[in-house]
C-alpha cells in the first residue's frame, strides 16, 4: 500500500494570519502550471480560506479560526462528476483537476460538498488547491501553505491510510 499525502489542521493553533491563503495566491494567481492548474484569478478566489467562528460575548468571547481547502477526499465526488477523466485521485492521495480536460465542466463546483472547487470564469474551468502537486512532484517535502504557517497549525504528512484512522 502506497503512502498518501494528508494535511492535518490544528485549529487551536490557527491565528488567522492568512499566510496560507497568501502563499496559494502567490503560487497560482495569474500563473499556469501545465498539467496541474490554469492561472488562478488575482481576485475573488480563496483556494485556502479561513472560516471564523465566534461564541459568547463580552467579557467572555471565544473566537476560532478554521482553515478550509480541498480535502482530497478518498472517494472524491468531483472525480465521479468529472467527464473524460478531468479529475484524478493520484496514488499518493492528491486530487488533481486537469485544466485542459476540465474546461467547461462547471458541474465540478457543485459536486464538492465542502465548497472547495471554484469556477474560473476567465479560463472557463473548475479549480481547487491541488496540494501544490507540481511542487511535490519536484521534490518539495511539504506544500507552501505548511511552509509559511508560523504556528504549525498546518502539517503535511505522508502515511498509509491505516495510520490516519
Residue ranges and their predicted role:
Residues 1-165:
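Non-ligating segments of multi-cofactor redox enzymes
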Amino acid at each position: 500500500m502506497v503512502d498518501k499525502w494528508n494535511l492535518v489542521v490544528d485549529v487551536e493553533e490557527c491565528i488567522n494570519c492568512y499566510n496560507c491563503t497568501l502563499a496559494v495566491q502567490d503560487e497560482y494567481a495569474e500563473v499556469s502550471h501545465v498539467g496541474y492548474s490554469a492561472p488562478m484569478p488575482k481576485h475573488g478566489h480563496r483556494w485556502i480560506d479561513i472560516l471564523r467562528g465566534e461564541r459568547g460575548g463580552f467579557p467572555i468571547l471565544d473566537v476560532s479560526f478554521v482553515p478550509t481547502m480541498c480535502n482530497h477526499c478518498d472517494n472524491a465526488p468531483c472525480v465521479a462528476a468529472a467527464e473524460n477523466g478531468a479529475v484524478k485521485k493520484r496514488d499518493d492521495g492528491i486530487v488533481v483537476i486537469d485544466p485542459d480536460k476540465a474546461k467547461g465542466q462547471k458541474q465540478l463546483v457543485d459536486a464538492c460538498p465542502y465548497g472547495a472547487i471554484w469556477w474560473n470564469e476567465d479560463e472557463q474551468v473548475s479549480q481547487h488547491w491541488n496540494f501544490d502537486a507540481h511542487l511535490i512532484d519536484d521534490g518539495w517535502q511539504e506544500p507552501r501553505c505548511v511552509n509559511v504557517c508560523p504556528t504549525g497549525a498546518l502539517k503535511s504528512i505522508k502515511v498509509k491510510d491505516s495510520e490516519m484512522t
